[in-house]
A protein has these predicted regions:
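Helix-loop element at the rim of GNAT/NAT acetyltransferase active sites that forms part
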Residues: 5-21, 58-60
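A short, internal acetyl-CoA/4′-phosphopantetheine-binding micro-motif in the GNAT/acyltransferase core
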Residues: 71, 76-79, 103-112, 138
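Conserved acyl-donor/pantetheine-binding loop and adjacent beta-alpha core of acyl/acetyltransferases
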Residues: 58-99
Length: 180
C-alpha cells in the first residue's frame, strides 16, 4: 500500500508540492485513504514501477483522510490538503455504471519512457467489464496526452481550471476510450 502511495506521490509530485515537497511524507499522508481494490500495479522484479486506478459511479479509488493529512503535513496544510484533495479524490462521478473512470496513472521516474503506462492502461481495461473509459489530464501534460491518444483515447471536453495560474495549468482535458 505504501509503495503504491509512493508511486502516486512521485507521479503527481508537482501537484502535491504546494502541500509538501517530500514524496515519502506525501505517500505516508495518503496511504490510509487508498482503496486498494481499485488499483492496478505494474511490478518489475518486485519493484512497483507504475500504478493506476479505475473507479466508477459507485466509488472512487481514494479518500482524503483529514487526520493523516494533518499528521504528516501539519495542522494548517493538513486542513488545506483535506479541502483540496476531498474535491479531487472523492467527488461523485456522474458517468453511468458502464463507464470506468481511470485515475492516478503514475509511473516511477526510473521507469518512465518505457511504455509502462500504455501497457498498464491496455491490460487493466481488458480485465474489467466497462464498456468505455474516461480520464482527465492537464493541458500541459503532453507525454500523458500522447500516451492516451496512442492507445485510442479521444478528447471530448475541456474545462478551464479555477486557480489555474497557481496550479500551473489552464485546462483539464477529458478523454474517452470506447471498446470497438
Amino acid at each position: 500500500r505504501n509503495n503504491v502511495a509512493l508511486c502516486i506521490a512521485e507521479g503527481f509530485e508537482k501537484d502535491f508540492s504546494i502541500l509538501c515537497k517530500d514524496n515519502q511524507k506525501v505517500a505516508d499522508a495518503i496511504t490510509t485513504g487508498l482503496n486498494m481494490e481499485r488499483f492496478y500495479v505494474a511490478d518489475i522484479k518486485g519493484d512497483i514501477a507504475g500504478v493506476l486506478a479505475i473507479s466508477d459511479c459507485n466509488g472512487r479509488a481514494a479518500r482524503a483522510e483529514k487526520a493523516s493529512l494533518k499528521k504528516h503535513f501539519g495542522f494548517i496544510k493538513g486542513i488545506i490538503g483535506t479541502f483540496i484533495l476531498k474535491e479531487e479524490f472523492e467527488k461523485q462521478l456522474e458517468y453511468p455504471i458502464t463507464t470506468g473512470y481511470i485515475e492516478f496513472v503514475a509511473v516511477r521516474k526510473k521507469y518512465r519512457k518505457q511504455g509502462i503506462a500504455a501497457t498498464m492502461l491496455q491490460e487493466s481495461m481488458l480485465l474489467t467489464n466497462y464498456q468505455d473509459f474516461v480520464l482527465d489530464v492537464t493541458d500541459i501534460n503532453n507525454n500523458a496526452i500522447k500516451c492516451y491518444t496512442s492507445i485510442g483515447f479521444e478528447e471530448f471536453k475541456r474545462i478551464p481550471e479555477k486557480h489555474g495560474k497557481q496550479k500551473g495549468f489552464n485546462e483539464k482535458i477529458f478523454m474517452r476510450y470506447c471498446h470497438k
